Amino acid sequence: MTTLSKILCVLIILLLCFSFRYSLHEDGNQQSSRDFVSTAKAIKYGDVMKKMIRGRKLMMASGEKEEAETKMKRGNRETERNSSKSVEEDGLVAYTADYWRAKHHPPKNN
């Protein structure tokens, strides 16, 4: 009997802790008391940032065309930037993949 009462007590405490984790706001929506929102909810409501900066590159978070970023206007013509990467940016990359092409240097002692 004491084991059953202990288990019941622990379950009640966990239920209360879980219920106090959420708070009702003025508009009646039940939201978490934490400061962050999941990405799925942010995309659903449109609160996601359009651009995010990662390293030295400006990446588009909304899936816009990247072709506009890789083209430059020089005078009257458009030229594409030559990239030395051997891995395309359109999918997952194996952890052991070569990320850069081999660079061919002239012989050292000729």
UniProtKB/Swiss-Prot annotation:
This protein's name: Protein GOLVEN 7
A GO CC term assigned to this protein in UniProt: extracellular space
UniProt keyword Ribosomal protein, yes or no: no
Taxonomic superkingdom: Eukaryota
Family: Belongs to the RGF family.
Changes seen on gene knockout: No visible phenotype, due to the redundancy with other RGF genes. Triple mutant rgf1-rgf2-rgf3 shows a decreased meristematic cell number resulting in a short root phenotype.
Signal peptide (from-to): 1-23
An annotated GO BP: positive regulation of cell population proliferation
Modification sites for Hydroxyproline: 107
GO molecular function: growth factor activity
Tissue spec: Expressed in root tips. Also present in siliques.
Additional remark text: 'Golven' means irregular waves in Dutch.
Biased segments, Basic and acidic residues type: 63-88
InterPro entries per the UniProt record, alphabetical: RGF3
Residue(s) carrying Sulfotyrosine: 99
